[in-house]
């Protein structure tokens, strides 16, 4: 099974460039700048990025609830036979509230810890994601058994960001594939969170510290761009 087909099975909700790129979009008529994690490139205009935008949009149509996609980024190789690691950036509209950014980030951190530590919540979330994912795969003619966001939880947080991890597993044509997803959420306004996700093959080495560091830096730099 080639990497692109493997990617199709597990895609979800997680040579390097020498500098960090920035991406911009509008939120409620306000220009927002975000920092792309170091070592990754904007994939908006290549084949992989265009496909990913379509695939994630189809997942949402099939019932996947999650951040609104703003950007897909890749490993800068522009090679469909070598797509890992890759990731995306999304936004979460929290809604109008009377909290400061600092208060909302703290509340966000606590909520993530509580929800991802609650077995019934994680089971329901996993089931919903798996159904949306499998239905989307069927749209592309792929049949697979998938287990998403296993072994999930908060691995680190501070006043600026919360970082989580999860494991995705799939079996297709008798072949098993495992991915690790590292994600982060940072509040840049009291009603807007920026979520980053990096996905890689689980057997690609010690990834948690490496990707957590990249997401922490990208999140903190993004918060300074506001």
Label each PLM-derived region with a short phrase.
Residues 16-20:
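Sec/Tat signal peptide C-region and signal peptidase I cleavage site
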Residues 22-57:
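Start-of-domain marker
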Residues 36, 104-108, 207-215:
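Stable alpha-helical elements in mature extracytoplasmic
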Residues 55-174:
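Conserved polar/disulfide-associated segments of primarily extracytoplasmic proteins
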Residues 178-189:
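Short, surface-exposed beta-strand/loop micro-motifs that present aromatic residues
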């Amino acid at each position: 099974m080639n990497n692109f087909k493997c990617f199709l099975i597990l895609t979800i909700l997680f040579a390097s460039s020498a500098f960090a790129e920035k991406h911009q979009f509008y939120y409620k008529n306000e220009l927002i700048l975000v920092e792309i994690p170091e070592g990754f490139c904007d994939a908006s205009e290549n084949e992989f990025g265009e496909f990913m935008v379509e695939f994630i949009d189809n997942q949402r149509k099939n019932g996947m609830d999650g951040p609104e996609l703003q950007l897909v980024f890749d490993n800068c190789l522009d090679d469909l036979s070598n797509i890992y690691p890759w990731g995306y950036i999304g936004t979460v509209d929290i809604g109008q509230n009377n909290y400061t950014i600092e208060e909302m980030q703290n509340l966000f951190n606590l909520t993530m810890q509580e929800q991802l530590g609650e077995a019934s919540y994680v089971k329901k979330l996993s089931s919903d994601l798996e159904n949306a994912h499998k239905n989307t795969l069927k749209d592309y003619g792929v049949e697979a058994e998938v287990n998403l966001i296993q072994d999930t939880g908060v691995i680190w947080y501070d006043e600026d960001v919360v970082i989580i991890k999860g494991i995705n597993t799939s079996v297709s044509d008798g072949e098993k594939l495992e991915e690790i997803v590292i994600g982060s959420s940072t509040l840049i306004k009291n009603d807007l969170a920026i979520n980053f996700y990096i996905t890689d093959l689980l057997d690609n080495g010690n990834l948690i510290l490496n990707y957590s560091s990249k997401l922490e830096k990208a999140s903190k730099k993004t918060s300074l761009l506001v």
